[in-house]
Amino acid sequence: MKIYVDADACPVKKEIERVATRNKIVVLLVSNGGLRPILNPFIQNIFVSTDADAADKWIVDNGHANDLVITADIILADNCIKKGMLVLKPNGEELNQKNIGNSLSLRDFSSDLRAANPFYQGSGKTFSKQDKIRFLDSLEKVVRINNQNSRPT
């Protein structure tokens, strides 16, 4: 398993680095160049063009089934799930075949609300310490399951 991170606006990069280093998992931080490189043998900094969705396309093109993707981008999550990849949002919520349809519908509904009312800005919920804790719990669970499944029997 590798971990692909839609890194430009990801608030949990340090947490991902800690868990990945402890478990010796390769992490690919994919961004359009707006990040300071992390010097860690388990972290690869992938810089893509500034074209719209270039990082998303790179992740989908390079990821494989059972790799993990960290993103808040619902469209990217949907494309990764279709390839058999695992997806976690930075708040720890797992996205999968069972719930991605609801997430896509909510995204479309919110987009329609913004289009109909330019003063509607959405919930604006800030990223909290609880979100970070929930993310770490979810990431540790995925890594633990991966480690159990990759052991020789």
Where do the protein language model's features map onto the residues?
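Nuclease catalytic cores that cleave nucleic-acid phosphodiester bonds
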Residues: 2-153
